[in-house]
């Protein structure tokens, strides 16, 4: 189980990313449309002044049961070992174990 502080930090990043999403997207469009390099630098400075944690690359997918940041399956929102345990316990409908 991940520490609660890490999970809360990730939630805070997610809120910041949602808050600044439109601002960042519009700034990037302005950079692409700007005719001169000096205009691009001004817009880039505005983009850099937004909080670091508002960038979408700072987000991690976490297992919603354990909070584990690695080996997550997007379809289920679970980490690999929790997914395996739930499939073995028949708690996920439609998921089957492979055997060969």
Swiss-Prot record:
Superkingdom, taxonomy of origin: Eukaryota
Keyword terms, alphabetized: Chloroplast, Plastid, Ribonucleoprotein, Ribosomal protein, RNA-binding, rRNA-binding
UniProt-recorded Gene Ontology molecular function terms: rRNA binding; structural constituent of ribosome
InterPro entries to which the protein is assigned, alphabetical: Ribosomal_uS14, Ribosomal_uS14_bac/plastid, Ribosomal_uS14_CS
GO biological process per UniProt: translation
Compartment list: Plastid, Chloroplast
One cellular-component annotation, GO: ribonucleoprotein complex
Principal subcellular localization: plastid
Gene3D superfamilies in UniProt: 1.10.287.1480
Keyword rRNA-binding belongs to the record: yes
Function: Binds 16S rRNA, required for the assembly of 30S particles.
Quaternary structure note: Part of the 30S ribosomal subunit.
Entry's family note: Belongs to the universal ribosomal protein uS14 family.
Listed name of the protein: Small ribosomal subunit protein uS14c
Lineage: Eukaryota, Viridiplantae, Streptophyta, Embryophyta, Tracheophyta
């Amino acid at each position: 189980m991940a520490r609660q502080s890490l999970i809360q930090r990730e939630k805070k990043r997610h809120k910041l990313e949602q808050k600044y999403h439109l601002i960042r997207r519009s700034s990037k469009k302005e950079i692409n449309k700007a005719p001169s390099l000096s205009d691009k630098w001004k817009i880039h400075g505005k983009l850099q002044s937004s909080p670091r944690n508002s960038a979408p690359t700072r987000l991690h997918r976490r297992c919603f049961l354990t909070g584990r940041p690695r080996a997550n399956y997007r379809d289920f929102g679970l980490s690999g070992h929790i997914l395996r345990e739930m499939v073995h316990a028949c708690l996920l409908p439609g998921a089957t174990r492979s055997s060969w």
